[in-house]
A protein has these predicted regions:
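A short glycine-rich, Lys/Arg-flanked "PGG" loop and its adjoining helix->strand segment in the class I
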Residues: 178-201
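Conserved SAM-binding loop of SAM-dependent methyltransferases across substrates and taxa
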Residues: 104-116
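A short acidic, Gly/Pro-enriched loop at the edge of an enzyme's catalytic core
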Residues: 150-158
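Class I SAM-dependent methyltransferase Rossmann-like catalytic core
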Residues: 49, 53-88
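Conserved SAM/SAH-binding beta-strand->alpha-helix loop
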Residues: 126
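A short SAM/SAH-binding and catalytic strip from SAM-dependent methyltransferases
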Residues: 157-185
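Conserved beta-strand signature within the Rossmann-like core of class I S-adenosyl-L-methionine
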Residues: 202-209
Length: 323
């Protein structure tokens, strides 16, 4: 499967292989020597990293399609996740399938080749990406628009892969977030229902966080359950995971409780304790980390307590802490 995907990406999209996001600017300079030609794309890239938002995302991808070979670099940064998706998705998807944020169609095009028996659709909010996608991957039906707003008949499978966090991530964000921090950071309970409009009741939602910071597979799983999704399951671990779930007839309304902010001195003490607990967990000193985290812990403290309990094989207590 990896070799088949790599050949497809190379032949249709000019992708040479994986590219670390930290190497994007250097690789762009290597492939496009003129500073003047790459300046607009670099400006859009840095704006996307610094401030995010829909317009920053649109600008980056639009400028990327105006620069020769930059499209391939974009796919290079997503390459390892594309390999993971290409391996795990074909046997799981069904019916009419929509990929949200398909860019120029590399993933949806490959999946269509693996499952030609299904009806494949691609959605993107960048007009230039859709126009090029129709040429690159004419085998799928293309739609222009942003998932939160577009009106389309509901699908049997909805793919939210490396798209939900985009535009809401900055370089100061932690790699992993506790569930509540994840819900707040990405406005999960406000935004997810807007995407889920495109999925029929009983249809399959597939969430992949992609190469972005702020991962929380536990947050995705618990968030979907709170919204009423059932048959929630996770595939993969660590950097590479998918969460699959079935949409209910009607989504539940979920509102996070607003907690009163603690006094500055107390907040500082809590922050220090959390930092120490994280360090102890990383060092494998689980019992010591647990001693810093009270049973009534909430938010990130509860998440860290659950991790410590799992590591100590106290699974029932861990599940209670992570609820």
């Amino acid at each position: 499967m990896p070799d088949e995907l790599r050949l497809f990406l190379k032949e249709r999209f000019g992708v040479q292989g994986p590219l670390s996001p930290g190497r994007f600017e250097a690789e762009l300079a290597k492939r496009l020597g003129s500073p003047a030609r790459r300046a607009p794309l670099l400006k859009a890239w840095r704006a996307d990293l610094a401030q995010g938002g829909r317009e920053a995302v649109r600008s980056f991808y639009r400028e990327g399609l105006n620069v020769t070979k930059a499209e391939a670099l974009v796919y290079g940064m997503h390459h390892p996740h594309l390999e993971f998706y290409a391996k795990e998705l074909p046997p799981r998807v069904e019916g009419r399938v929509l990929e949200v944020g398909a860019f120029t169609g590399a993933l949806v095009g490959f999946l269509q080749r693996k499952r030609p028996d299904l009806e494949w659709h691609a959605l993107d909010g960048v007009e230039e990406a859709v126009a090029l996608g129709k040429k690159r991957v004419p085998e799928v039906a293309w739609h222009l628009g942003w998932a939160e707003e577009v009106e389309l008949p509901p699908f049997d499978t909805l793919l939210l892969l490396s798209v939900f966090p985009e535009g809401l991530v900055d370089q100061g964000l932690e790699s992993r977030l506790a569930p509540e921090a994840f819900w707040k950071r990405f406005a999960f309970f406000e935004r997810l229902p807007l995407f889920a409009r495109l999925l029929r009741p009983g249809g399959l939602l597939v969430y992949g966080h992609g190469p972005f910071l702020g991962k929380s597979p536990e947050g995705v799983e618990e968030g979907l359950r709170r919204l009423g999704f059932d048959r929630v399951e996770r595939v993969g671990e660590g950097e590479y995971f998918l969460v699959l779930a079935r949409k209910p007839e009607a989504l539940a309304a979920v509102r996070l409780e607003e907690r009163e902010a603690p006094p500055p001195e107390e907040a500082e003490e809590v922050a220090v304790a959390l930092e120490e607990a994280r360090a102890l967990l990383e060092a494998g000193r689980y019992a010591e980390a647990l001693a810093l985290l009270p049973e009534e812990a909430e938010g990130e403290a509860a998440y860290l307590r659950g991790r410590a309990l799992f590591a100590l094989s106290r699974h029932a207590e861990a599940e209670e802490a992570l609820r």
